Amino acid sequence: MTLLPATLYAQIEQSMPIACVDFVLVRPKSGTTSLTEVGLILRHSPFGEVWCHLGGRIQRGETIAQALRRHAREALDVDLKLPRDIQPSYVYQWFPPDIAPSDGTLHGDDPRKHAIGLSFVVDFIGTPMPQGEALDVGFFSIENLPAPLWPGCEQLLRRLFRQPSS
């Protein structure tokens, strides 16, 4: 695969939305079979060190499943259990503040780019080991998320797990 020069990619990022995958790992809460914990990573961001879901852009020629697996490997060295034709559970938008919608559209904050996040809840295989952008990994109940979270991440998680906003 040919990668774009950094300057050209930066120009593209400033000119159009970027297709991304956003996902959280899930596992049963310790001692239960019905409650779920979500896996989040701690990472550097424009907001300092924050907890957030995993994900990133989809590369040209890459399927959604391949993008999900690549980001899981690069951040946590795990594989994912995915159906053959995986479909997003939610589509979430991320905007820089200067172009963020003011009409009440739910969105996350990303000062770097406008992104369309195909969002997933996925099972994984292996033991998560933080690497690459992941400084740490933790599993949390949706009712007890860590702080600080990337702005918009909590709203995305609540939509993925159909929880009311706090």
Predicted stretch roles:
Residues 25-27, 42, 124:
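Residue-level signal for short segments within beta-strands and strand-turn junctions
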Residues 33-79:
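Conserved Nudix-box catalytic region and its N-terminal flanking loop in Nudix hydrolases
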Residues 119-121, 129-162:
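NUDIX/MutT-family hydrolases
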Residues 77-127:
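Active-site segment of metal-dependent pyrophosphate-handling enzymes
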